[in-house]
């Protein structure tokens, strides 16, 4: 992902304020609600019967935190996202058989969650920078599929 110095500063500056444990569960929960076909990968998480059940499901919240923590780790390696996410790409491709489109969807949902929490700070320029990053992460996670 090619980011200008200003974009890197915007992304890392805002990320320092992200409540990973809270926003991760919200992002994954929203993915499962908005795109219900993604639930098939999480059937072992228990009750996913409606939005309220999903958004309060402890396994969804815990996995969302894990996903967002991994995303945050990627921000430390913006120049090598493919290498950073190589093992996760292999896992999701070879073992879990996740449709790589889901990575793009989750990235877009994450942008929505950030906009929801950061209002005025989440300017169009900040959104554009984050959109580059989530696209780069999605591409890195889909790399094994190519």
Curated annotation (Swiss-Prot):
InterPro entries assigned: Globin (IPR000971), Globin-like_sf (IPR009050), Globin/Proto (IPR012292), Hemoglobin_b (IPR002337), Hemoglobin_oxygen_transport (IPR050056)
One Pfam family hit: Globin
Entry-annotated residues carrying N6-acetyllysine: 59, 82, 144
Residues reported to bind heme b: 63, 92
Alphabetized UniProt keyword annotations: Acetylation, Heme, Iron, Metal-binding, Oxygen transport, Phosphoprotein, S-nitrosylation, Transport
Function: Involved in oxygen transport from the lung to the various peripheral tissues.
Protein name (Swiss-Prot/TrEMBL): Hemoglobin subunit beta
């Amino acid at each position: 992902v090619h980011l200008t110095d200003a974009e890197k500063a915007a992304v890392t500056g805002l990320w320092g304020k992200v409540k990973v444990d809270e926003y991760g569960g919200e992002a994954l929960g929203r993915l499962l609600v908005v795109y219900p076909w993604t639930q098939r990968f999480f059937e072992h998480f228990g009750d996913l019967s409606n939005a309220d059940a999903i958004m309060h499901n402890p396994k969804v919240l815990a996995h969302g935190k894990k996903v967002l923590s991994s995303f945050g780790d990627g921000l430390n390696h913006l120049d090598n996202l493919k290498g950073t996410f190589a093992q996760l790409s292999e896992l999701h491709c070879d073992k879990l058989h996740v449709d790589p489109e889901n990575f793009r969807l989750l990235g877009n949902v994450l942008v929505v969650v950030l906009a929801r929490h950061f209002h005025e700070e989440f300017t169009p320029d900040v959104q554009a920078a984050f959109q580059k990053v989530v696209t780069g992460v999605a591409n890195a996670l889909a790399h094994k599929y190519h």
